[in-house]
Amino acid sequence: GLFGRVNYNYKQKYHASFTIRRDASSKFGKNVRWATFPSYAIGYTFSEEPFMDWARSVLDFGKIRVSYGKSGKQFDQPYISHGLLTVSSPFLGHPTVQPEWSQGLMNDKLTWEETKQFDLGLDLDFFQHEVNITVDYYHRLTDKLLYNITLPGNYSGYQRQWQNAYAIVNSGIEFMVKWDIIRKEKLTWNMSFNIARNWNRLKKSTNGMDFQNFNGVENFNNNLSVIGKALNGIYVYKDKGYYNSESEIPSYYLNGTRVYTYGSNIYQF
């Protein structure tokens, strides 16, 4: 891989940084193993401006940060894009060299899992830097996530294949306060408080399916992920309550005989 970075600082007020990476991995197919990952960041230290003189007795430092970047991740398994062959049984303690069958469908289009992230932050220092406040907002899109999907039908005897099949969005806010209660030469005591809130949702899934279970079993339990909704949501039938007596159950056989059901939910469809 290759790596480069350029930094710029003007009067300790205006800051800019540009970074670019060009990486390759033999884990991927030969036509998709190279990828470029740029990132950009700018900062504005507004506390150095003359118009902030009125607040200098309280505000020591104030800075706004904005950044955007793209990064890549390799999968752990080194050969799933190339396919694996199983050799025949050992002969006199040594495995033979004749391959017998493939352990799965190869996919030479498997490539990097990509993450694109936007960040907006604010840094504030008060009272001779005794109190520090940091606020951050982020929006992160993780695309081309690796998953062993179920193929339609029975393709060449194999029912599943590894693909770059999912995209997930995370966004959130982080807030932190740090307070130096005691700042002496031989004694330092500080406290910090932080709180964060994250929202996530499934951006897309295999074959555009609305419901997808990440455990590999589709639509067979209550734990599902729906496109546009939070991951791993719990979905159940909506009901009106419970029958309290037999007389409330409007169920009959074709011959007119009542069907007796005990303790059943009243479902809405």
Describe each region flagged by the PLM.
Residues 1-238:
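Extracellular/periplasmic, surface-exposed regions of secreted and cell-surface proteins
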Residues 254-255, 261-269:
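Short, intrinsically disordered, charge-balanced linker/junction segments flanking boundaries
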Residues 245-246, 269:
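Alpha-helix N-cap recognition
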